[in-house]
Structures are given as structure tokens and as C-alpha cells.
Amino acid sequence: MHKKSIDHVIAINNAWKVSCFWNELIYPEDFPESKLPPVVHKSKKLTSAETYVAAQNNYGGFIYGGGTMAFTAGYYALYQYRPKTIAFIGCDMMYPEEGKTHFYGDGTADPLRDDITLQSLEAKSTRLMIHAAKQGCSLVNLSQDISRLTFPKISIDLLAQPPKLIDWNILAEKEALQLERKLNYFVASGKYWEQVHLFDKVNLQKIDQLWLDCIKN
């Protein structure tokens, strides 16, 4: 990986094992301690729910933002570092029935569980991308494989020049945000699964569709 145009690398969950060139590891509350790095150099940082929940809450919380670490890491990076570009790699959330899905073997990750916040990964991806663009930040996908992320795909060699910000339908975004505020589906602790009975699946589908309507290919 070329480091010239990359200021900060955030590894998600087990991804710290891929390379030693990471600055920060972000992981969920239920991540086994045995899977954390055995030794963490003073130049590296571990980030848990104690830090990232407040960050994602700043963008509407986990019910609207999506309860999976790929999106949580994105909102955290936006809040904490306010970068011009966030480049994702290895976060495509594709899980074929056969074959290797992760560098460590077969994965059964967050997007496969029955989660009311993850009915449309594409919608949640688009929502994150638009919130980033409003901060002047471009989201891109460095993976060249099929992806559930809706971010533009680019080569890592092009990161030295900040990618162009996306265009989106402002009216559709306004409608999505208005519906989010009206429903007020928010759990400050981030533990939305403890109150999932309070949230309507169909209403969340409506919000997802509005975010998808923001960008028409």
C-alpha cells in the first residue's frame, strides 16, 4: 500500500492483521479481547464504543446510519478527523455462499444478521457519502470487486489528488432528513437492539428509499 497520500489508516475489527501499516483500530463492544493486538505500540490507537458512539450520534445515530462497523468507522472518521477524502478497502460486504470471503477465511459478518438498521446497505452507504460531501469530504472505494458500497471506485494511485465531490438531489435529502427527525428513532447509548420494538421497519424502508433517490445513476 502506498502511504504517500494516506495520512491515517483505520483498521476495522480483524483487519489489523492484514498489515502493520495502521494507525488506529476500531472495534465493537462485543469484539473478543483475545482478537485484539497482543501488543499496541504507543504510536497506535485503539478506539471502542466509548468513543465512536458519540461520533455516530452526531450524524443521527445508529438506526439511521446503520449498525455495522464499516459505516460506524466512516462516521467516526468524519467526526474525529474531518478529512478531505476517506478511502475504503476490503469493506464490500459481499458474502458468497461458497469460497473465501475474508483474508482469514469465511466470514459471517454484521450485514448478514437480521438487523432493522441494515435493510439496505446501499442506502446506508449513500447516506454516509452525502453526509461526508456536506463536510467537503469525498468517499471512495479502493476495492475493485463487486461491492454493496455506493462510493465511486478509484485506484489508490489517484488518492494524491482529492476526488471530486459527488452531486446529489438536495430535495430528496431534505425529505429524508425531515422524516428522520419526525420519527426520532434515536438511542443515545448506541444499543438500539435493546429497543428495537420501538422502531417501524416500513418507516425505515421509506427513509432508505429517499436516500437512494438522492443519487440516480
List where the protein language model places each region.
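Metal-ion/cofactor- or nucleotide/acyl-coenzyme-handling active-site neighborhoods
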Residues: 1-217
